[in-house]
């Protein structure tokens, strides 16, 4: 077990070193509105940390919470409307599309990531994200690096996330 853990830690260190010299760090928001609240990962959460490790600026990085933070749509929009990327997780039979996202909540279309088609989704009904990623953060980090910095990790195929289709 120690050997496996050490190998994963080395993979993570190597991936972080890959993005460390980059001068550009794209911004990212995550998740979706659920009822009256949009639950975002706190700035001290594992998600926030892995976004930073992947060379991105998480728009709520300055938040002091380590868990989910319920926010009003307007708060997320104010801070995240110009984010370069948007990562969502959902569970449904077919993959989510831009059309469906717009039908779910029309104000989503105001986000730059929506307009520029830079939304990536993880369909947890098809992908073992919650079962796999806690034990393989190196795999998740690799996905995020490929999303945020597409010229890196040439030939790598995303494991958890896919770019939303129209």
Language-model regions: role of each:
Residues 1-12:
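Single conserved hydrophobic/aromatic residue that forms the stacking wall/gate
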Residues 2, 20, 110-111:
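Short secondary-structure boundary/capping segments
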Residues 6, 88-166:
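Structured C-terminal subdomain patch of bacterial secreted/periplasmic proteins
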Residues 13-98:
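Flexible, glycine-rich surface segments
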């Amino acid at each position: 077990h120690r050997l496996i853990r050490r190998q994963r830690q080395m993979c993570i260190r190597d991936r972080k070193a890959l993005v460390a010299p980059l001068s550009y760090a794209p911004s990212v928001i995550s998740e979706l509105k659920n009822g009256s609240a949009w639950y975002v990962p706190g700035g001290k959460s594992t998600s926030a940390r892995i976004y930073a490790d992947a060379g991105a600026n998480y728009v709520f990085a300055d938040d002091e919470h380590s868990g989910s933070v319920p926010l009003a749509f307007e708060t997320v929009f104010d801070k995240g409307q110009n984010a370069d990327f948007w990562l969502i997780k959902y569970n449904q039979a077919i993959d989510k599309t831009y059309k469906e996202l717009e039908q779910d909540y029309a104000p989503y279309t105001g986000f730059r990531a929506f307009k520029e088609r830079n939304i990536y989704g993880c369909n947890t009904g098809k992908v073992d994200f919650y079962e796999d990623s806690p034990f393989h953060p190196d795999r998740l980090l690799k996905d995020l690096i490929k999303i945020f910095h597409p010229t890196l990790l040439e030939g790598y195929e995303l494991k958890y996330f896919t770019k939303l289709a129209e």
